[in-house]
């Protein structure tokens, strides 16, 4: 019984002397631990013998918890030099009561676990990439040019491609009236290139029959590849519109909206996921219901309107009847015939000139040109193809801007190519020299 009481007494004596300055004091204390008989030699405590030297050094418990490794190294080394291995075994008996509070505290302050700054370094890299690529992405969008498309014609083995020699630059919006139409300047001029796949050279354009060559054009947004240009309209949020879907779009409303919203450019072509050969699309008017209906499950929506995957059509409803008509954003001569013309270098070729194109709304757009041969393959005769005529080539123009009447800087000067074609009989508006006529800054045109 007396031997059982001695261990707590000895533990109280240990923190009293300060042996941090010299090694002998700890040896004296360990000799005192030998006097009490070791009636309890459990092996479990013997494993803790490596850790008990840690508690004696701290005079203040809290500051020394963070530095457990140094004391054990000095204490163990001192014991080994003095050659007292037996004193090293009875150590767990004295600090046993002190260990009851320590085991839970030792695993926490391990210095290796306190090095948390490395994760902070991983947090720093994410901000730079998020801020860095944003300007580069804008530059890529501005420099991006949609790819062109070309196809080899079956039967003839000719490969057709389009080359936009004269790009559109700017235009003035003409609104939704037809009285004040302003064409795109300069007029786009597209050259048709035909290569014989057998020889790898261009064909002789002087002997080629181009009467059945047709070029169509449509308007596309410059920053949204794969979507046609159209103007979105939305009703006030207080109005509840019905939904319905079939081949086109059905709308039903409890009360009619204002007539002003019935006018506006609507899409004329279905959107596609990527640039490719265009397909002509004619919107179909579907039924209209006066009672609102719920949208079908899984149907996508945009601005509160149901949207079909194959077509984008919108129509305002007044009293359950269609009030407005579909309106193109691009108006004018949307198809052009081919001409055999000479360029400024005197080389003959097949050209398409689109001098009568106007845009209703302001913005930045692109033109897409699509070439079709409606005649027999290979130019065999002038018979019209009674079946389907595939699109043999398509390309996109550079982006151009359409200004409002107040912001419009003026039409572009007539280019040498436009003047060259005008001299050959193509009706292109040519801007006359104002100084000769004495009209000042007034713009004058000569319709050839």
UniProtKB/Swiss-Prot annotation:
Cellular location(s): Nucleus; Cytoplasm
Keyword vocabulary terms for this entry: Cytoplasm, Nucleus, Sporulation, Transcription, Transcription regulation
Ranges where the Velvet domain occurs: 155-431
GO biological process: sporulation resulting in formation of a cellular spore
Gene Ontology terms: cellular component: cytoplasm; nucleus
Gene3D superfamilies in UniProt: Velvet domain
Main location: nucleus
Sequence segments annotated as region (Disordered): 1-153, 224-306
Pro residues composition-biased segments: 35-44, 52-61, 116-132
InterPro entries: Velvet (IPR021740), Velvet_dom (IPR037525), Velvet_dom_sf (IPR038491)
Compositional bias annotation for Low complexity: 15-34, 96-107, 260-292
PROSITE patterns with a match to the protein in the record: VELVET (PS51821)
Top-rank taxon: Eukaryota
Effect of disrupting the coding gene: Suppresses aerial hyphal growth,reduced colony surface hydrophobicity on solid media, and increases the ratio of macroconidia to microconidia. Reduces the production of fumonisins.
Biological role: Component of the velvet transcription factor complex that controls sexual/asexual developmental ratio in response to light, promoting sexual development in the darkness while stimulating asexual sporulation under illumination. The velvet complex acts as a global regulator for secondary metabolite gene expression. Component of the VELB-VOS1 heterodimeric complex that plays a dual role in activating genes associated with spore maturation and repressing certain development-associated genes.
Oligomeric and partner information: Component of the heterotrimeric velvet complex composed of LAE1, VE1 and VELB; VE1 acting as a bridging protein between LAE1 and VEL2. Interacts with VE1. Forms a heterodimeric complex with VOS1; the formation of the VELB-VOS1 complex is light-dependent.
Family the UniProt entry places it in: Belongs to the velvet family. VelB subfamily.
Listed name of the protein: Velvet complex subunit 2
Organism in which the protein naturally occurs: Gibberella moniliformis (strain M3125 / FGSC 7600) (Maize ear and stalk rot fungus)
Lineage: Eukaryota, Fungi, Dikarya, Ascomycota, Pezizomycotina
């Amino acid at each position: 019984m007396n031997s059982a009481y001695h261990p707590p007494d000895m533990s109280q004596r240990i923190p009293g002397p300060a042996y941090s300055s010299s090694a002998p004091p700890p040896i004296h204390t360990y000799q005192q631990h030998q006097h009490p008989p070791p009636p309890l030699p459990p092996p479990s405590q013997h494993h803790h013998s490596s850790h008990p030297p840690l508690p004696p050094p701290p005079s203040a418990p809290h500051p020394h918890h963070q530095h457990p490794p140094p004391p054990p190294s000095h204490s163990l080394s001192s014991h080994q030099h003095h050659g007292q291995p037996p004193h090293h075994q009875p150590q767990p008996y004295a600090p046993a009561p002190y260990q009851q509070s320590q085991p839970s505290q030792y695993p926490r302050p391990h210095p290796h676990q306190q090095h948390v700054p490395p994760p902070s370094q991983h947090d720093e890299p994410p901000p730079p990439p998020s801020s860095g690529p944003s300007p580069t992405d804008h530059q890529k969008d501005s420099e991006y040019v949609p790819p062109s498309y070309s196809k080899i014609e079956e039967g003839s083995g000719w490969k057709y491609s389009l080359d936009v020699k004269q790009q559109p630059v700017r235009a003035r919006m003409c609104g939704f009236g037809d009285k004040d139409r302003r064409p795109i300047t300069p007029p786009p001029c597209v050259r048709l290139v035909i290569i014989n796949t057998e020889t790898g050279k261009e064909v002789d354009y002087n002997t080629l029959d181009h009467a059945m060559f047709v070029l169509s054009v449509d308007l596309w947004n410059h920053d949204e590849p794969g979507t046609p240009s159209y103007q979105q309209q939305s009703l006030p949020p207080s109005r509840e519109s019905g939904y319905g879907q079939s081949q086109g779009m059905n709308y039903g409303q409890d009360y009619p909206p204002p007539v002003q919203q019935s006018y506006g450019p609507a899409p004329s072509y279905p959107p596609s996921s990527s640039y490719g050969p265009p397909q002509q699309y004619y919107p179909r008017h579907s039924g209209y219901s006066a009672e609102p209906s719920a949208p079908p499950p899984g149907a996508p929506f945009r601005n509160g309107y149901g949207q079909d995957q194959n077509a984008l059509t919108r129509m305002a409803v007044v009293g359950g009847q269609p009030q407005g008509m579909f309106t193109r954003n691009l108006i004018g001569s949307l198809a052009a015939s081919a001409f055999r013309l000479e360029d400024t270098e005197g080389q003959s070729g097949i050209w398409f000139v689109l001098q009568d194109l106007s845009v209703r709304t302001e913005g930045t757009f692109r033109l897409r040109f699509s070439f079709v041969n409606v005649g027999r393959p290979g130019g065999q005769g002038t018979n019209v193809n009674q079946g389907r005529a595939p699109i043999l080539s398509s390309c996109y123009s550079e982006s151009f801007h359409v200004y409002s009447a107040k912001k419009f800087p003026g039409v572009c000067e007539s280019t040498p190519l436009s003047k060259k074609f005008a001299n050959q009989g193509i009706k292109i508006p040519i801007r006359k020299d104002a100084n000769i006529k004495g009209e000042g800054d007034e713009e004058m045109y000569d319709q050839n």
